[in-house]
Amino acid sequence: MIATSTAIITPAKAQDFIGKQQPVLQSDRMTPEALWAMGRIGGFKVSPNGKQAVYAVTYYSVKQNKSHSVLYTLDLNSHKSTQLTTSTHSEMGATYVNGGKEIVYLSSESGSSQLWKMNADGTSRQQISHTQSDVADFLFSPDEKKVILIMEVDQNHSIQKNDADLPLATGMVINDLMYKHWDTYVTSAPHPFVADFDGTTIGNAQDILKGEPYECPMMPFGGIEQLAWSPDSKSIAYTCRKKVGKDYAISTDSDIFLYDTATGSTTNLCKPANYKAPTVEADRSLKDQAINHPNTDCNMGYDQNPQFSPDGRYIAWSSMERDGYESDRTRLCVLDLRSNKKTYVTEKFESGVNEFCWSKDSKSLYFTGVWHGKTNIYQTNLKGEHKALTADVADYALLGLSPDGKNLYCKRQSMSSADEVFVLPLKKEAKAQQLTQENKYFYDNLTFGKVEERWVKTVDGKEELCWVIYPPHFDPNKKYPTLLFCEGGPQSPVSQFWSFRWNMQIMAANDYIVIAPNRRGLPGFGMEWLEEISGDYSGLCMQDYLSAIDDIAREPYVDKDHLGAVGASFGGYSVYWLAGNHDKRFKAFIAHDGIYNTQQQYVETEEMWFPNWDMGSAPWKKAADGQVQKVFSTSPHLYVDKWDTPILCIHGQKDFRIEYTHAESAFNTARMRGIDAQLLLFPDENHWVLKPQNGILWQRTFFRWLDKYLK
């Protein structure tokens, strides 16, 4: 039996505390308000004795328009969760120390983000770090005598410092690329500091990258998983792309470095000591350049997330083969520190590796990877022989191994369930067991639609996997308006994901059938399928979308006169392109943060390796046949003379990946052509919509637009 969370403690400032919510639901249909009331499970750590775990749950207040993270403990035998913290300040990153008697975590209770310590029962809270800068993350050495602290340092390579006598000046003098990244102007970089810990206080922090302008972890999404301690606590393996400015902007070549804490010496584990990179042309793809054809044993692409084997003999990490290709297949590279030999142990797995961890005996690794629209758990030995440990219609993410090595802890989600914590016993034919019931209230009181796997024949005779999500209380004798969901990435899987924005069940709850194709360019179907999108945005992947909607439209319960297409990022590009090429299939479009003009995108985005690889080169360079690259000659904005359908354009003005000018351009175009259109701008959001009230406004605007034209 699985127990629900109990022993909820009332905080001193109950009116300000954002915690677990059980709102009164108006019906059994998912609503934006219900979606934002759900808890979101974060980090999870098991105690050294394997009897309990500490984990974080983030809750959102629509009224206060902010989030708050709370710590819980979980009894791994009874499955009972107990709320551990009641502060109005968020706590996160919790881990056990002192044999499991104490928990260290991050909190901003003192006014800045610092490390705090408490007893395992939540008593005796005390601050143990007092750094001048905020601590973003941390990692204790196995002997707990040292700790890595991630803190920001000034970085003024691209944006120079203003004159000291102009402290109120807001202008920025920019001298190189990568002056902005994701949603931030780059004036600092995260660095790892190694500090001493005596069990009570943290001090004497030393910057591993002192004097270097590089970042570790890598921005914008890297975390403490990009660093690892050796089992003897003497070495640190860390991830770093030692480049700045334009060199950084065109390259995905990060490496794994080994740092000796006693001597301060650093060794690059990915390249020989005498390696010198060849000169590259910055404004065209690195695919066929010399950088991707080394004549020595070099790792040229993304190398990140190192983990030492428990016996200390090996280091494993995630490795991509090619520089400049951020969606290359991620392989598991294992380096034998005795022989200095590298082995890629997932070569026979025809998809990429997500998270991974070592077995207790150092003889195998566990990993997750997507295959045919589902992310399951696998095991590989050091010879590269792998097997599946789960085969569920779900998406798993590894959290770690139990101290005795007998259980894997993981999070599992699906299109019908947000993340919950599961345990997978590592014995023959064992099934994953659910440990948490964070959102049980919602699952007990809401009705979700059926999710069905459907294979569609493509124009070139191949098979395309689509997920079809039906409305709750589906009646096959009725006709339903139907949505084509266009995935972003452009090489991100349409797997069994749960999204708090692009949520399939909330679309179904509004009486829409949704078809979500794994079109050309998505992982989980082999390398040929994955790479048939690069340089050809408007080709087979667009035909795959049309094949999917045409196939489902033949069903008697689909109202083929009321079809819509929706999508974000590359999905937004897809919507803009389909608007001029759909042959009157659709009656409404919604594009979120999409690319409207590919030439505009090339010169506006910040990570230049991405358009170089996907578009082939800069728009001012010709392709090998002397023509303009196909991605530019088939840009969505070149088909606006054929636009004839109402369109909603949504964009965040802090989105530096795809600038909001794309949405403004598309909206202006539609209105000038007399087409009904609406523009939803978020001045304070990036590529995503993260604030509760903005999220609800997004959902309401989304469905008002669809209902207006499809119902």
Where on the chain are the PLM-derived regions?
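Predominantly five- to eight-bladed beta-propeller fold
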Residues: 17-20, 68-69, 152-211, 239-242, ...
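A short helix->beta-strand "capping" segment at the edge of beta-propeller domains
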Residues: 19-39, 203-213
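Beta-strand-rich domains and repeat architectures in extracellular enzymes and scaffolds
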Residues: 33-69
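Conserved beta-propeller blade repeats
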Residues: 39-53, 88-104, 125, 132-147, ...
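Short glycine/acidic-enriched loop and turn motifs that connect beta-strands
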Residues: 59-63, 109-112, 154-157, 243-246, ...
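Short loop/turn segments that connect beta-strands within beta-propeller blades
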Residues: 75-79, 119-123, 197-200, 260-264, ...
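Cap/lid segment of the alpha/beta-hydrolase catalytic domain
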Residues: 244, 286, 430, 438-561, ...
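Active-site-proximal cap/loop segments of hydrolase catalytic domains
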Residues: 503, 508-509, 516-711
